[in-house]
Amino acid sequence: MTPPALELTLPEELLLLALDPLRGKPYCAGRSLEYGTAGAVLRELEFQGRVTGQGGRIRVLNPHAPPDPLLAHVLESLSAPGTGWPAGDTDTRRWVRQTGRYVQELCLEHLVRRSVLRRETHRFLGLLPYHRHPAADPALSLAVRDRFTAAEAAGFPDPRGRTLAALVSAVGLSGAVARGGLRQRWAMYNLVTEEWTAEAVHRNVRQDRANRNRRMRYSSGGGGSGGD
């Protein structure tokens, strides 16, 4: 039986694309997905006319709470017009970096409450708890994947599809969800610079990669200097 249609926000679609429906494990780096979820929330708010992005900053256009409780909570946390950061706006890259984990947790809890995902608690080495979020109904995750594949085949003709494709590429998911091969993955990568939220996400992902590479160089002895 086909599951009933369920209205999903952009961050929810991204999470359903990113999580293995059976194991609940992300197909990309967990921190990158946190950035992507935060970026998707911002773009969803922009689609609803609540915020916009200008010069790498978030500007609130309409501070009135949207119906979705998650979006309302995030909007409330942003600067209202004329308050907060200078000129009443917030640095996009910094906001994505600082709030990504919290925003993703809110999204996951929202999906669990709606019985879209299940929350399973595991323990690393029998001690440290961590969570996995498999699909409550794998058919719904498959439907989201099928919609993405159809949009990919059509060249992502609408703004929402292009944003989702850009976020998928920015967090490193294109290899797991794209079906058009290397050429299509490059096309998705090129969308990143066209989408202000995806660009902020990608900058944070690159920063993490650079930090890891730097730590690896130092740990292997390449960061020191010697001499007589």
What name fits each language-model region?
Residues V51, V116-L117:
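Short hydrophobic beta-strand motif reused across regulatory alpha/beta modules
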Residues G55-I58, T121-G126:
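Short, Lys/Arg-rich nucleic-acid/phosphate-binding segment
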Residues M1-Q98, R214-D228:
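Short, amphipathic alpha-helical interface elements at domain boundaries
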Residues N62-L106, R113, G126-A166, A170, ...:
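Short, amphipathic alpha-helical interaction segments positioned at domain boundaries
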Residues A38, R101-Q104, L140-V144, N204, ...:
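Charged, low-complexity, helix-prone segments enriched in Lys/Glu/Asp/Gln
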